[in-house]
């Protein structure tokens, strides 16, 4: 998986990001952490981990994604959460699928059949269903 870069935006994630990076050690891919330039706690927590740290020029999650994506040099990338909410065991499967089926991109969702999340409540699920339905009315692919 050396042809894959994980783009990991992080802000105030010094307490959990080191464990996420430890879990990602077994995957031979690049780990690009985009950190708010003033977030000394996160930077110091991960500076000895096997990752590249990119300090954001402009603040905000969207800007972190843009700056990170613009920095990627590998043919494939994955936007990965810094808080450990994604299970990396699916990375190989998703990368194989994109290569074998010649896809341009893949979306993963915890709301697909046989997927889920431990932190979803009934209200969260109901709200997501309603907003997805409304979004599909206007932006159906």
Label the predicted regions.
Residues 35-43:
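A conserved acidic beta->alpha catalytic loop
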Residues 13-16, 38, 61, 87:
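Donor nucleotide-sugar binding loop of glycosyltransferases
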Residues 3-5:
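Cell-envelope/extracellular polymer assembly enzymes that use nucleotide-activated donors
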Residues 12-26:
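Short, well-formed alpha-helical segments that are part of the catalytic scaffolds
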Residues 57-59, 63-70, 76-79, 88-141:
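Acceptor/aglycone-binding surface of glycosyltransferases and processive sugar-polymer synthases
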Residues 31-33, 105:
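Hydrophobic/aromatic residues located in beta-strands of well-ordered beta-sheets
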Residues 36-37, 80-82:
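Active-site acidic Asp-centered loop
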Residues 27, 48-50:
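Short, structured coil segments at secondary-structure junctions
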